[in-house]
Amino acid sequence: MAETFGMILDGRQVPALEGETFPVVNPANTDEVVGLVPRGGREDVRRAVDSALNALENTWWPKIYESRRRGRVLQRFAELVDARKEELARLLTREQGKVLKESIGELDSLINTFDYYSGFGGKLTGTVTYTRDGESVIKVETRKEPIGLCAAILPFNFPVSLYAWKVAPALMAGNAMLIKPASTAPLTDIVLTQMLHEAGVPAGIANLVTGPASSAGEELIRHPAVKKIALTGSTSTGKHIYAAAAEGLKHVTLELGGADPTVVCDDADLAAAAETIVRSGRFRNAGQSCTSVKRVYVFANVFDEFSRLVADQADRLRVGNGLEAMTDMGPLNNAQVREDVEHFLADALHRGAVLVAGGGRPEGAGYAKGYFLRPAVLIDVPPDAEIWHEECFGPVLPLMKVRDLDEGIEKANSSPYGLGSAIWSDSDRRIEEFVDRIQAGMVWVNYKPLSIPEAPFGGVKDSGIGRELGAEGLAEYLETKSIRRYVGKALS
């Protein structure tokens, strides 16, 4: 029988006020219900808000002089997660679908992120300077203060690492956090939020509500007490939240869609580029990543060789249940995502694209009840195919010939998105030209799409607003207050 999980309110798991639940199924076998979670609504969000406001008013957590103490709590949380990493990784794979080694990597990302932000304890310092106003001497101080109650809206693709990107800096800054996980992958986030309280976060500072976006989600983004919203999601969802936030002049951090391009030059290590793009760039997490490689522009004089290398690497990937040791790529997370990916593939083929690897649903008893797709590689994809212009959130990789770097950059910049980008080249001149001209928030050079706590993460154009990770990610959760104090008359 499936385990019943609760929302987290005041440090405890509680049911929804209406008492309803909904199932979370295993995307590798939809007959398996991994857990039942509360179907929260507007009133559940309101009581979570009241709980958080009470905690901000009556606990030590938001005090500007307690940052070292908060840092110790975050470090303790990272240690608790590390002790349960294998258990949590298996739960993550069962609810999300990704292979176990990727789930372990995601838990490592969370641990590293909380460890990184814990190091800001005692370092949230302001400034002091002196100036004069006529005959008066003025002491000018600044201090960093928490925003207050913040909301995190999480996606299904990386429910653990993106939890850390939002929750760790928000808590380090002294805020309270109201967390809404994705309905298809909320279970690990529920356990993590319970563990925050075990680590020493006061009751009410980290609450979690599960439920539909149409009710719980809407109340969350429109409630006047919520002062900041952090979302990872689609561009359309981000624009909706941005408009709602504007009504209350709320702070926002929006990490939205991406159609990340990679340019492969003729002086690149083609074998390394092909292996990295396939194994770490496009098909990791079944292609369900904002920063996965979604468009590849290859110099024409090496296109045939490179496309063969990519197709060979893709054909080697073993699709299956993420808990099985031999699996390289698990299922997609849900039926709608698979249908959307199949549409992109069908559209490209209808317009004349050539499939050189994979494609379609794998056959066999082990695949019948899961959301599986074979990794697909396409060449000769017409420029009007939808996959060049919209985000395909799954395992399809289109390759296009370009004459030179200039055309490659032009094609790369033709998308409305501007999240990540990459170049493979042995030429410093080419690399610097790409870095200077590419319209993207991030660039990877001869490497996989890597996210690390020390480096700010975010995009331009339709890929979002604000930055997560790094010192910039912490600044998104702080207000600056300035104090002008008269201290006496200036000497003449």
Model-derived features: positions:
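Residue-level signal for inorganic ion chemistry
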Residues: 30-31, 70, 92, 114, ...
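Glycine-rich loop-to-alpha-helix module at the N-terminal edge of alpha/beta enzyme cores
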Residues: 30, 34-124
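Hydrophobic face of amphipathic alpha-helices that form TPR/SEL1-like repeat modules
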Residues: 1-29, 55
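Rossmann-like NAD(P) dinucleotide-binding subdomain of oxidoreductase/dehydrogenase enzymes
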Residues: 126-272, 402
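ALDH superfamily catalytic-core signature
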Residues: 228, 236-382, 445, 491-492
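Conserved C-terminal structural/oligomerization subdomain of aldehyde/semialdehyde dehydrogenase
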Residues: 32-35, 226, 263, 318, ...
